[in-house]
Amino acid sequence: MGEVWRWNKEVEMDSIRDCLKHFSSIAIDTEFPGCLKETPMDASEEIRYRDMKFNVDNTHLIQLGFTLFDRRGITKTWEINLSDFNEHKCFKNDKSIAFLKSNGLNLDKIGEEGIGIEEFFRDFSQILKEKDGKITWVNFQGSYDNAYLVKGLTGGKPLPETKEEFHETVEQLLGKFVFDVKKIAESCSGLSSRFGLQRIADVLQMKRVGKAHHAGSDSELTARVFTKLTFDLLNSRKQCVRRVDHQQYQLEQQQLMMTRCYIPIPIPIPRPRSVMFAAHHPNPYFGGGYFGMPVQGRNYVL
């Protein structure tokens, strides 16, 4: 895992550029000073976006982690340390800052040796342009991750006013292929969208590389979980298709057997011969009169 600071930025950015020539999927994670406005659980989508916009517009990103990967595996993870946040001067959520510190983030070092947000995103934007939008982005519960990316890639401008405009901006900047692992987990047996990243990794028996709640480690784990879940879903889909094909084959065989054995086959029935009757003289023993008597030995066609 590569830690990116002001003093090694040039080398690491060149490494990112080279790796993006061969890998087109990026898993991201962000660490930021928490939420200034807490959103109620039952809030509408409009209120959720309004609160997110307020929080992102008024805070500074602390770390950006991203991992380049494809279906063959992971190439490398970078943890970008960004220097704009100042614990003593900037807006923050005190509980969130205490939480980050308890998990080992050295905010003083990041502020002193990190890279300016504007400087980093200027270089990063240029690298992304070279890919011409052919990138798949992956996150975990990534609304804020996407929001900080949009803010950075637009030069620190406020987020769009509405969630519809925000989604359009995300598509313009990141493309159409943006996946949230938390939502993918809804479709997987034994998992739930209520699970956090670490719990999903535990269910999948995946060991973390690095420390939790560090942007680099979280992005690396997100990439591996995404690869595992999508691989399993693909296999599950293939198995489902095979089961359907097998059931269809059995049905066709049953229909074929019905055709062979149970559909009535018409059997030709010979046309009966016509019988001509001839009048005979009355028998004197039966009271007289005439009666019909079949003519023997002759065939007549009517």
UniProtKB/Swiss-Prot annotation:
EC numbers on record: 3.1.13.4
Gene3D superfamilies: Ribonuclease H-like superfamily/Ribonuclease H
A Pfam family the protein falls into: CAF1
Names of the cofactor(s): a divalent metal cation
Cell compartment(s), UniProt: Nucleus; Cytoplasm
Disulfide bridge positions per record: none
One term under GO cellular component: CCR4-NOT complex
Gene Ontology molecular function: any one: RNA binding
The keyword Ribosomal protein is assigned to this record: no
Record SUPFAM superfamilies: Ribonuclease H-like
Protein origin, superkingdom: Eukaryota
Keywords of the record: Cytoplasm, Exonuclease, Hydrolase, Metal-binding, Nuclease, Nucleus, RNA-binding, Transcription, Transcription regulation
UniProt subunit comment: Component of the CCR4-NOT complex, at least composed of CRR4 and CAF1 proteins.
Task of the protein: Ubiquitous transcription factor required for a diverse set of processes. It is a component of the CCR4 complex involved in the control of gene expression.
Annotated PANTHER family: CCR4-NOT TRANSCRIPTION COMPLEX SUBUNIT (PTHR10797)
Name by which UniProt lists this protein: Putative CCR4-associated factor 1 homolog 4
Organism: Arabidopsis thaliana
Lineage: Eukaryota, Viridiplantae, Streptophyta, Embryophyta, Tracheophyta
